[in-house]
Amino acid sequence: MPQYRSRTSTHGRNMAGARALWRATGMGDADFGKPIIAIANSFTQFVPGHVHLKDLGQLVAREIEAAGGVAKEFNTIAVDDGIAMGHGGMLYSLPSRELIADAVEYMVNAHCADALVCISNCDKITPGMLMAAMRLNIPTIFVSGGPMEAGKYIADGETRAADLITAMVVAADPTKTDEQAAVMERSACPTCGSCSGMFTANSMNCLTEALGLALPGNGSLLATHADRKRLFVEAGWQIVDLARRYYEQDDEGVLPRRIGGFKAFENAMSLDIAMGGSTNTVLHLLAAAREAELDFTMADIDRLSRRVPNLCKVSPSVSNVHMEDVHRAGGIMGILGALDRAGLIHRDCATVHEKTIGEAIDRWDVMRGGETAKTLYSAAPGGVRTTEAFSQSRRYESLDLDREKGVIRDAEHAFSKDGGLAVLYGNIALDGAIVKTAGVDASILVFEGPARIFESQEDAVAGILGDRVKAGDVVLIRYEGPKGGPGMQEMLYPTSYLKSKGLGKSCALITDGRFSGGTAGLSIGHISPEAAQGGAIGLVEEGDIIAIDIPNRKLDVKLDEATLEARRAAMEAKGKAAWKPAARERVVSAALQAYAALTTSAANGAVRDVTQVQRGR
């Protein structure tokens, strides 16, 4: 029978000093026998997805204590990728994931907490906390801040939906007036919450449901809706129950690695492919699997992408569907239900709220569940600008239950037989590359064009806005991988500017960097190995023909092996200047240099490899 971890610091005469300090936090004699539950909050006034979280940690804390536990809250950092986008701030986004994972580990292990509630929301916070949960392997529940309401604006007498990407594209469109750009800017992000499309934040919060680590509705129930409060209340009670089951009943089935096993990761990836989630989710699932000591790889993602259909298209893949629309159609349990009917879900995986994910689907899929499920998914946007959580209680008059032409489709009515994400391989992507196929127009699934080479995101932006890119070109941005950036910047501005220039359906963009969840179009990222690690993307020259074949999962430069080997020899002959951008001025801080020294390929989730340090001793 496992002992409560917290008793290391609360029991025994020699822990009098520690107990004295615990008492100074408000604990008394009766508390020293209770489970101590850590609450990892991520409140910050920098990020709209986190601005409303300040009081939610204490909401969970009150419920934990009512359930018989002791709650102790702490905070992590949280970077807003949208605000950090397009300048040097983006170098810090992916590295912050590792810092968040470490911060949670440090606080939980330093204070011997027994269990964990993760209050996350945006791009790197949920992945960082997920990595920590798998690393620590103590009872854990995720409850996120929830999605933002979609923006609304009037055009041609009609009300239309908008989001951050809409504002960026309009601002860069020379045919739009300053007034039009200002209207879109003020309309795009009306409330607190994670940006309203199927971008990275919402994708990851949806995946925690499929992994079994979050309650139904976590990924799609709006931040502003009063119903979301229930998730925080239930999380507080449920985590105490999980802690008691593990420490008092020796039930290892409640641990993250048992809930989030290999089959659960397959479920999560199948959901991701079906809903056309952000390509960043591939990085994060690979990283979390590594922390869980699972052999879940790009090969598994490739295998799943060939059998799981695309059942849902959400912004940025389409402009008129946002998370609030997914929720009205049944949310993540609705998509999992459609996958289940097609035999594409492992029903026997455990969850933190039901015995199995199969039982959860039976209860919460609106196509088979009862009134409780229908009530949950009737929560609607309030249409009022606010930064307050749970501030409105509007409901839809009806749900979207159309599985033929609705927001969520059944497998027989899928948007495409192949899923919304795909892994490509070829002579410039020996270890793979990722594309969000859900966002690619059918006319350019097969594409060839001359490479237009840029060795930084900044140069690519200047080239696109300076009309150096034409229809039919392949924009190639390199030395932006995990090591080469460092930090693997997102290329949202280049892809958005291609759209604003009218090139969104006539150009491709390939990179060893990554993309925002807001990116759509023929955008291929995570090319591995990256240029800074000797990847062949570093050997491509201006005008070389790039061949893309998504149906056959191919990405190549049309050069023979002898030519590539000759170029590789010439590159290696440069000595210390080899595999570095020819002319790029970029200040790289000591913190980022430390990240670059330990990080690994995108094909491995860009996780740290500390054996590099051990080998150097």
UniProtKB/Swiss-Prot annotation:
Q: What Pfam family does this protein match (any one)?
A: ILVD_EDD_N
Q: Which GO terms describe its cellular component?
A: cytosol
| Binding-site positions, Mg(2+) | 81, 123-124, 490
Source domain of life is Bacteria
Record key words, sorted = 2Fe-2S, Amino-acid biosynthesis, Branched-chain amino acid biosynthesis, Iron, Iron-sulfur, Lyase, Magnesium, Metal-binding
**Assigned EC number:** 4.2.1.9
GO terms for molecular function, please? 2 iron, 2 sulfur cluster binding; dihydroxy-acid dehydratase activity; magnesium ion binding
Binding, [2Fe-2S] cluster: 122, 195
Q: Which residues carry this modification: N6-carboxylysine?
A: 124
Catalytic-site annotation from UniProt: 516
Cofactor binding mode and count: Binds 1 [2Fe-2S] cluster per subunit. This cluster acts as a Lewis acid cofactor.
Swiss-Prot/TrEMBL catalytic activity: (2R)-2,3-dihydroxy-3-methylbutanoate = 3-methyl-2-oxobutanoate + H2O; (2R,3R)-2,3-dihydroxy-3-methylpentanoate = (S)-3-methyl-2-oxopentanoate + H2O
Q: Which cofactor does it need?
A: [2Fe-2S] cluster; Mg(2+)
Q: Which class of enzymes does this protein belong to?
A: lyase
What Gene3D superfamilies would the database entry show? IlvD/EDD C-terminal domain-like (3.50.30.80)
UniProt pathway: Amino-acid biosynthesis; L-isoleucine biosynthesis; L-isoleucine from 2-oxobutanoate: step 3/4; Amino-acid biosynthesis; L-valine biosynthesis; L-valine from pyruvate: step 3/4
Matching InterPro entries: Dihydro-acid_dehy_C, DihydroxyA_deHydtase, DiOHA_6PGluconate_deHydtase_CS, ILV_EDD_C, ILV_EDD_N, IlvD/EDD_N
Q: Name one GO biological process term.
A: isoleucine biosynthetic process
Q: Which family does it belong to?
A: Belongs to the IlvD/Edd family.
Q: Subunit composition? A: Homodimer.
The job of this chain, per UniProt, is described as: Functions in the biosynthesis of branched-chain amino acids. Catalyzes the dehydration of (2R,3R)-2,3-dihydroxy-3-methylpentanoate (2,3-dihydroxy-3-methylvalerate) into 2-oxo-3-methylpentanoate (2-oxo-3-methylvalerate) and of (2R)-2,3-dihydroxy-3-methylbutanoate (2,3-dihydroxyisovalerate) into 2-oxo-3-methylbutanoate (2-oxoisovalerate), the penultimate precursor to L-isoleucine and L-valine, respectively.
Q: Which NCBIfam families match?
A: ilvD, PRK12448.1
- Please identify the protein, giving its name as recorded: Dihydroxy-acid dehydratase
* Source organism of the structure: Acidiphilium cryptum (strain JF-5)
Q: What is the lineage of its organism?
A: Bacteria, Pseudomonadati, Pseudomonadota, Alphaproteobacteria, Acetobacterales
Record gene name = ilvD
